[in-house]
């Protein structure tokens, strides 16, 4: 890859890094992706509602949370036409490049950022070199800025290559809240896709190390549950109330006692509780946010069913009502060995690659599995590839950063894999 091409990848990544946006509010990010696609020159660009199955969106925020981000994008110069197409939380893009007869290959990457205040320390490179987040309280702390740069670089490299076939790049919104994968999977854009790839940078793999395909991403469900009781004076007549706080506390304690399953690992966590009004008032309403995970989709469903049973039992014990609601979820889908082999063989020939791991357990959750499942259920193959990158601190921390040398490695591996698949089917 030329020096100019490497520099462009770095510039792209830094542009995305400066303008992080949370799930379903990635208006500037969507606009920048479209701008770059138009520069590259692709055959089709589907934006917003054209890129999604609207009714399948999950964890969509309220309008009053979306509107400030749309207004910010308008002030930044995003066109009224694009904002109209993405308004109401309909971000996302699908680009299609057609280059003759051959396989249809999909590449999925994610658009959104995380609610973290980025470090202002001088030894934090984005601060030192002038590309720290300009959106206070939000940051690309998981590498999605790198994913976007790699995807756009791959698309341009494939266009300039001997690739024969169709390449679809799916820029998915709302990965961090597991909200966009299902909507993009059911959009129709995966119809006819033979091979689908997703990618992630880092995850404790250094620059030059590649994982050709992950196994066992944990299936996951986010839930919220609101306990409704009756308020009363906590000193004079506590017996006249129905204590929603006590019901929630019982539910939380018992959630961690869900029996382990013989078929594999499960996880449960209650990460947030909110409710009540004063120490002398029996709490009338309390809301908790929880999640369950499982080594398989069936195990996640088991944990979710058990958690819901506990919620209802705790509510009944304290004469309360409870309304659990699944906000978002994602399945467990493994990478296909045939694609792992192709990626691994290609990676060994890419400049900068020092170590190739055929497969490893993922250990976290990822709603890109919806897209993988959609393709595999239709008879195609899918793989989730890890591109190593040196990062000074862990993902989801204020000082997270990447080694930009890994961008070119990611582009070269993916583009050369796609060319190889257009020549020889596994």
Model-derived segments and their meaning:
Residues 246-426:
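Metal-dependent amide/peptide-bond hydrolase catalytic core
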Residues 2-139, 160-163:
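Acidic/His- and Gly-rich active-site-bordering loop/insert found
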Residues 58-59, 93, 115-116, 127-139, ...:
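Histidine/acidic-residue-rich, glycine-tolerant segments that coordinate divalent metal ions
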């Amino acid at each position: 890859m030329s020096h100019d091409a490497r520099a462009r990848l770095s510039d792209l990544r830094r542009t995305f890094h400066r303008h992080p946006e949370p799930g379903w509010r990635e208006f500037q990010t969507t606009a920048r992706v479209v701008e770059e696609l138009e520069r590259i020159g692709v055959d089709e660009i589907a934006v917003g509602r054209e890129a999604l199955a609207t009714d399948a969106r999950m964890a969509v925020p309220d309008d009053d949370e979306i509107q400030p981000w749309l207004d910010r994008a308008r002030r930044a110069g995003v066109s009224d036409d694009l904002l109209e197409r993405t308004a109401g939380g309909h971000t996302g893009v699908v680009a299609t490049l057609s280059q003759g007869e051959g396989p249809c290959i999909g590449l999925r990457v994610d658009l959104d950022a995380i609610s973290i205040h980025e470090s202002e320390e001088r030894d934090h490179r984005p601060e030192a070199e002038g590309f720290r987040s300009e959106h206070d309280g939000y940051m690309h702390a998981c590498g999605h800025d790198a994913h976007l740069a790699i995807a756009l670089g791959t698309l341009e490299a494939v266009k300039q290559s001997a690739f024969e076939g169709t390449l679809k790049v799916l820029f998915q919104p709302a990965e961090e809240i597991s909200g966009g994968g299902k909507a993009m999977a059911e959009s129709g854009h995966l119809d006819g896709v033979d091979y689908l790839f997703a990618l992630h940078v880092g995850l404790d793999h250094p620059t030059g190390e590649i994982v050709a395909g992950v196994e066992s991403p944990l299936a996951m469900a986010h839930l919220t549950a609101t306990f409704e009781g009756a308020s009363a004076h906590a000193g004079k007549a506590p017996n006249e109330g129905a204590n929603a706080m006590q019901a929630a506390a019982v539910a939380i304690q018992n959630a961690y006692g869900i029996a382990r399953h013989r078929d594999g690992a499960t996880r449960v966590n209650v990460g947030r509780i909110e409710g009540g009004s004063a120490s002398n008032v029996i709490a009338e309403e309390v809301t908790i946010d929880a999640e369950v995970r499982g080594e398989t989709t069936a195990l996640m469903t088991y944990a979710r069913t058990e958690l819901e049973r506990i919620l209802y039992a705790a509510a009944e014990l304290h004469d309360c009502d409870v309304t659990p609601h699944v906000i978002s979820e994602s399945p467990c889908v493994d990478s296909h060995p045939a694609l792992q082999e192709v990626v691994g063989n290609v990676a060994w020939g890419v400049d900068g690659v020092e170590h190739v791991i055929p497969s490893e357990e993922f250990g976290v959750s990822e709603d890109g599995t919806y897209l993988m499942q959609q393709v595999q259920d239709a008879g195609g193959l899918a793989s989730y590839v890890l591109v190593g990158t040196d990062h000074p601190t862990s993902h989801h921390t204020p000082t997270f950063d990447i080694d930009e040398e890994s961008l070119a490695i990611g582009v070269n591996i993916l583009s050369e894999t796609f060319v190889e698949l257009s020549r020889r089917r596994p």
